[in-house]
């Protein structure tokens, strides 16, 4: 049920390219039009050439160097301007295929335009919410939402969807509640009017003080394995993180380029689990989908205004928050403009977390999994 807001937006984040991005859309889907018979020529169209070329070009040059191939395949603006229907977004918070930045903050943009929208955001990945066996296989991942099993199983989701269709397509039944059902990585479901929610408290941690460097130097090398690791002091109380955390890092580079990957972990001693990550091609250091202003390498500095992929995580008292900076990670390609990136610690480099008070929230327990072998 995962949906796209655009083709480029699916496979690029702040200019950084997933490994599949340069060739998948046209190299894979486009190949369905070619099967080696004499009728192939009837299926040929310019996009078979333009598409892969644009994909490779977006990685090499950081954007659409010529033409409007990607712009034609961006859908969200037309939905916001023209759509008169309803939207029910069902999204896995750890979907490796359709990342949650397709749905967050899209859900709020829809609501702000008056479009009747609801969200069901659980800790599954690219699976249906009621597939017990597939979700069970995630339960020993060590993070990435696997710890939310079995509470992530939603046997009621298709009934919910049926009632949505009955109301909006047939006028039967009653109007659904237009809220967001969001699950934390520890399994608890709660109701939010919007997501990210508005009633949050920002916690700011400075690199070098609140987050102490515990290993590595200040340089991030373009080898995907060398960079600094920062860690907080043990938390005095439970921390509940939601939405789109930010990492603003002041850096200098050896060339006009480079890339930063940030891994955020919840650590109990040396036992750490993944709770979130962010990535940025530094040519996009101001954030967003447009190339940013240039800078002078070596002597000049820029602030990489990174935004994490949407997350909802609980970090318990006594645990620490660990931040690792590398040149790439997950399934992202190294930057075409690889460079040594030097982290400037201090007030210009901060991790910004949006937290909430669970006692202020409406929580509930969905239908419980009773599968005797798995739950």
Which stretches of residues belong to each language-model region?
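C-terminal catalytic histidine-bearing segment of alpha/beta-hydrolase fold enzymes
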Residues: 116-204
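Short beta-strand/loop motif that positions the catalytic acidic residue
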Residues: 83, 89-91, 95
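Accessory cap/linker subdomain of secreted extracellular hydrolases
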Residues: 1-82, 172-177
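Surface-exposed intrinsically disordered loops and tails
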Residues: 22-59, 130-151, 291, 367-375
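Intrinsically disordered, low-complexity Ser/Thr/Gly-rich stretches
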Residues: 206-375
């Amino acid at each position: 049920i995962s949906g796209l807001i655009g083709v480029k937006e699916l496979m690029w984040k702040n200019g950084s390219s997933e490994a599949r991005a340069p060739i998948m859309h046209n190299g894979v889907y486009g190949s369905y039009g070619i099967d080696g018979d004499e009728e192939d020529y009837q299926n040929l169209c310019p996009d078979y050439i333009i598409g892969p070329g644009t994909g490779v070009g977006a990685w090499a040059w950081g954007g659409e160097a010529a033409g409007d191939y990607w712009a034609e395949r961006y859908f969200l603006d037309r939905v916001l301007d023209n759509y008169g229907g309803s939207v029910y977004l069902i999204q896995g918070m750890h979907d490796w295929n359709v990342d949650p930045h397709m749905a967050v903050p899209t859900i709020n943009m829809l609501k702000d335009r008056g479009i009747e929208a609801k969200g069901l955001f659980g800790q599954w990945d690219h699976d249906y919410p009621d597939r017990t066996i597939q979700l069970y296989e995630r339960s020993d991942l060590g993070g990435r939402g696997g710890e939310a099993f079995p509470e992530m199983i939603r046997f009621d989701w298709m009934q919910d969807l049926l009632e949505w269709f009955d109301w909006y397509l047939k006028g039967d039944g009653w109007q659904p509640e237009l809220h967001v059902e969001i699950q934390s990585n520890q399994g608890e479901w709660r109701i939010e009017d919007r997501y990210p929610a508005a009633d949050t408290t920002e916690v700011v941690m400075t690199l070098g003080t609140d987050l102490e460097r515990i290993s590595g130097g200040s340089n991030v090398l373009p080898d995907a394995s060398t960079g600094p690791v920062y860690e907080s002091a043990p938390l005095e109380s439970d921390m509940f993180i939601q939405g789109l955390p930010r990492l603003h890092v002041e850096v200098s580079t050896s060339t006009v380029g480079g890339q930063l990957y940030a891994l955020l972990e919840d650590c109990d001693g040396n036992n750490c689990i993944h709770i979130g990550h962010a990535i940025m091609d530094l040519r996009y250091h101001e954030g967003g989908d447009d190339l940013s202003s240039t800078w002078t390498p070596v002597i000049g500095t820029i602030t990489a205004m990174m935004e994490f992929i949407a997350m909802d995580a609980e970090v318990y008292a006594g645990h620490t928050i660990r931040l690792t900076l590398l040149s790439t990670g997950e399934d992202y390609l190294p930057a075409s403009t690889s460079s040594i990136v030097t982290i400037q610690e201090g007030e210009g480099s901060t991790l910004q977390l949006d937290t909430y008070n669970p006692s202020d929230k409406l929580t509930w327990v969905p239908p419980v999994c009773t599968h005797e072998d798995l739950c």
